[in-house]
Amino acid sequence: RSIDVHAAGAVCWKVVDGEVRVLLVHRTQHKDVSLPKGKVDPGETLTETAQREILEETGLHIVLGVPLGKSDYRLPSGKSKRVHYWSAEVDPGEAERSSFEPNGEIAGLEWLNIKRAIKAVTYEHDGDILRTFETLFNNNRLNTFPVIVVRHGKALPTEKWDGPDWSRPLAHRGLVQAQDIAGGLAAFG
């Protein structure tokens, strides 16, 4: 089935006094409490969207961690929406430097322990993502680093290159491909 609206977000988290806390947003227009997320802009990857939306909604600069899955649901308009989520550990200094100010989209931010956060979110699908996060956290599965394997972009044809294959330069299309993927990879640090 096709998805009408694609979005991305993150479970932003930090440890305070030995207890994990996750960040929830109080959305003004929707009058709800949810995980920070937003719609994909044209030409943007899901990872770029997650990073941009967290910055816009919370003022936090984040690096994406472990993928937490996706939520599929229907909007009041009847359109289908899919939101992809990642974990994002927030450096304590970054949390203090956040430039967040209440605005027309987000009325406030709240750091809660997981149990309270699951009870506080308005939508069950946010609770599901938080439960996935909790399982991974409790099983020490969030302390990871990314290993991203990418095949090179389109290279010059072999018949147009005299040097060794490993030194064959990218064609124009390959350079465009490399530029297109850079932002999505940068979201992982």
List PLM regions with ranges.
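Unchanged
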Residues: 40-126
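Active-site-proximal alpha-helix that buttresses catalytic centers in soluble enzyme cores
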Residues: 144-189
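A generic fold-level signal
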Residues: 3-5, 17, 78-81, 104, ...
